Amino acid sequence: MRTLINMDGAEHAEFRRLTQDWFMPQNLKTLEAKVTEIAETFVDRMLAMGGECDFVSDIAIWYPLRVIMMILGVPEKDEALMLKLTQEIFGSEDPDMQREGTDEERMQFMMDFFMYFTQMTADRRANPGDDVASVIANAVIDGQPIGDMEALGYYV
């Protein structure tokens, strides 16, 4: 599977163009209120903790995740799963982030990630919304819809 990070030149530009409109200043303006609302939720959470918290585990890992999930269109109910999968993917060398069990069991996180986003892609193809996942799911390159693997590469 190829991701934007692994692409160069024209291929990278072509895939980047699929979602770049979402990140143009006029569209970021529309996201600003939602991002501010999420930030206020986390400020309220800190206040409810009496002004003291473990900033990393209580705020720093959750706030950016919630913003990214909102942009993608991932429901908040899946937040714990998304954190777990994100930590397993990007912290795969960190023993604290790895699953227990055999090598096969520990690698199951990739299948869980792929299954989640394959289902999400299928849903957005059938029911497009106003989110980046819908843009990715319904993207066309060279006159052809992108395949599931190309779409999955975008989520990584």
What are these regions (language model features)?
Residues 1-156:
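Cytochrome P450
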